[in-house]
Amino acid sequence: MKHSKKVWPEFFQKILDGEKHFELRLADWECNEGDTLMLQEWDPTTKDYTGRTMEKEITYVIKTKDISFWPKEDVEKYGYQIISFK
C-alpha cells in the first residue's frame, strides 16, 4: 500500500541527504512494514507543495501508545525521543 505524507523542507532535505532515517507521525492512519511512504515536500510558509517527492519503503513501525515501559507520569514529564542510528 502507498501512503502520501507532507514533509517540511528541512526534514525533506535531511531524508534526501541520507541523514534522517525515521518519521515521527501521529498514529491516525494505518501503515505496515513493506508499505511505501511517498513523501511530498510541503512549505509551511507558502502552504503549498514544492513539487519535490520521494518514495521510501517502510521497514519498521512502532506505535508509542502500545509502549508501556515507563510510568505515565514520566512520559508526561519528559515525553519521548525517537533515536535513529546506523
Residue ranges and their predicted role:
Residues 1-86:
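Catalytic phosphate/metal-binding cores of nucleic-acid and nucleotide-processing enzymes, i.e., regions
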